[in-house]
Amino acid sequence: MKILYLLFAFLFLAFLSEPGNAYKQCHKKGGHCFPKEKICLPPSSDFGKMDCRWRWKCCKKGSGK
C-alpha cells in the first residue's frame, strides 16, 4: 500500500512540473528564474518574484552572478 502512495505522489509531482508552462511571465520579459540569494547585475535587471517558484526571483538572462 505504501508503494501505491509513493507512486501516486511521484506521478502527481511529475505532472506539476510540465516545462511548457513554467515561468511564462518571467520568460516574456527576457528573464530566467534564479535562487533568491543570487545577485542580478545590473540591479535594474532584477524583475522580482513574478511567477518563479518560492524563494526564487526573475533576472534578465545572463545577469545572475
Swiss-Prot record:
Q: Where is this site: Involved in the interaction surface toward Kv?
A: Y23, K24, R55, W56
The positions making up the signal sequence are 1-22
Question: What is one process in the GO biological process aspect for this record?
Answer: killing of cells of another organism
Cystine residue pairs? C26-C58, C33-C52, C40-C59
Q: In which tissues is it expressed?
A: Expressed by the venom gland.
Tell me the keywords, alphabetical order: Antibiotic, Antimicrobial, Disulfide bond, Fungicide, Ion channel impairing toxin, Myotoxin, Neurotoxin, Pharmaceutical, Potassium channel impairing toxin, Secreted, Signal, Toxin, Voltage-gated potassium channel impairing toxin
This protein's GO cellular component annotations are: extracellular region
Any idea what job this protein has? Cationic peptide that possesses multiple functions. It acts as a cell-penetrating peptide (CPP), and as a potent voltage-gated potassium channel inhibitor. It exhibits antimicrobial activities, hind limb paralysis, and severe muscle necrosis by a non-enzymatic mechanism. As a cell-penetrating peptide, crotamine has high specificity for actively proliferating cells, and interacts inside the cell with subcellular and subnuclear structures, like vesicular compartments, chromosomes and centrioles. It penetrates into the cells as fast as five minutes after its addition to cell culture medium.
Name this polypeptide is given: Crotamine
Organism of origin? Crotalus durissus terrificus (South American rattlesnake)
